């Protein structure tokens, strides 16, 4: 995905998530760009997972608990129903795990 298209596609949702979780949306957008290779990762394209988030933990408001495994020996990863859910769960995780850094 072209970088410009990535920004145009995801920035509105990132901005909304940034406001909700009190994270600078530019920082959040940069983080998901790095994590997904500008939207090119299989987890992002096929499963709306914007941070390589593993399938551990309890379901959240944004993740219904769906897990996928990319290969027989890989970890399980979270699969989201849509991009908004994946971005919001990434922001939630950043805020809850790294609150002072955000």
Region locations from a protein language model:
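Catalytic cores of secreted/periplasmic lytic hydrolases that degrade extracellular macromolecules
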Residues: 1-102
């Amino acid at each position: 995905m072209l970088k410009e298209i990535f920004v145009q596609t995801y920035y509105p949702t990132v901005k909304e998530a940034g406001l909700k979780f009190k994270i600078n949306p530019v920082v959040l957008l940069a983080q998901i760009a790095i994590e997904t290779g500008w939207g090119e990762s299989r987890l992002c394209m096929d499963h709306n997972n914007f941070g390589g988030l593993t399938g551990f933990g309890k379901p959240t408001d944004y993740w219904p608990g769906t897990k996928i495994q990319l290969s027989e020996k890989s970890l399980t990863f979270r699969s989201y129903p849509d991009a908004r859910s994946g971005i919001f769960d990434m922001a939630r995780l950043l805020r809850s795990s790294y609150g002072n850094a955000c």
